[in-house]
Amino acid sequence: MDLSGLKSADRLENIIRNNPQVKLVVAGHLHRPIQTSFASTMVSVCPSTGNQLKLDLNPKNGSAVDEPPGFQLHIWKNDRFVTHTGVVWEGKELDMSQYVAYVNEKISKNEGIRKD
């Protein structure tokens, strides 16, 4: 994956640097969720909706791994953005309603939250 690279990366870098309004570059997919910076801008790469590649930092290696398909949800609001990376997997739902009520109560009283 890393050996593939981006052809004419210098051209893209020049475009981004000359357009400071570009705050996020979104791409996909590379079979792994990846975030990096490029030309002083955030880059977010979506995982595959099919198989994923095993996380291996040696670019000469590479193998598929049994991880669920993934997706990204990007939310822009004014000049800010948030990216959520999720997986397509039907996990067991956990009831956190009591904890959420506890946190909300502490927030309403302007109190800290114990982490023990």
Write out the residue ranges for each language-model feature.
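A broad, low-specificity signal for short, low-complexity segments enriched in glycine/proline
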Residues: 2-7, 33-37, 43-46
